[in-house]
């Protein structure tokens, strides 16, 4: 369910069409995107825009009730993992709900992206900078 404004028309459109429990992926520059899934490519060059910049814009617009993250981020990108957890804590406070955090293997994560409404690709070039956002409702 859409809750704000965003300039990118593709992102705005996909968020406005999300129903309860639909999913949307924000990923790094290297995640393979299934051909059957809508790709919204924001990457300009390495690191631009960053994963957290894209995620911040998307979560400002989207009501989130759960997220799925690859377990490997804890070991291979601990700094981003901590930044991500802090962002999710702040988002919970802003939205007034609890966001369930689910971990899975990176292989299972890649398989789950096929069921998403879209994959938004950032320019991030650090390992496991990927998240599946599960849409909530604002009421």
Swiss-Prot record:
Active site: 20
InterPro entries: D-ribose_pyranase, RbsD-like_sf, RbsD_FucU
Keywords for the protein's UniProt record, in alphabetical order: Carbohydrate metabolism, Cytoplasm, Isomerase
GO biological process, one term: D-ribose catabolic process
Keyword Ribosomal protein found: no
EC annotation from Swiss-Prot or TrEMBL: 5.4.99.62
Record's catalysed reaction(s): beta-D-ribopyranose = beta-D-ribofuranose
NCBIfam families named among the record's database cross-references: PRK11797.1
Entry GO MF terms: D-ribose pyranase activity; intramolecular lyase activity; monosaccharide binding
Function description: Catalyzes the interconversion of beta-pyran and beta-furan forms of D-ribose.
Organism: Escherichia coli O1:K1 / APEC
Coiled coil residues, start to end: none
Family: Belongs to the RbsD / FucU family. RbsD subfamily.
Positions of substrate binding: 28, 106, 128-130
Listed transmembrane segments: none
Name used for this protein in its record: D-ribose pyranase
GO cellular component, one term: cytosol
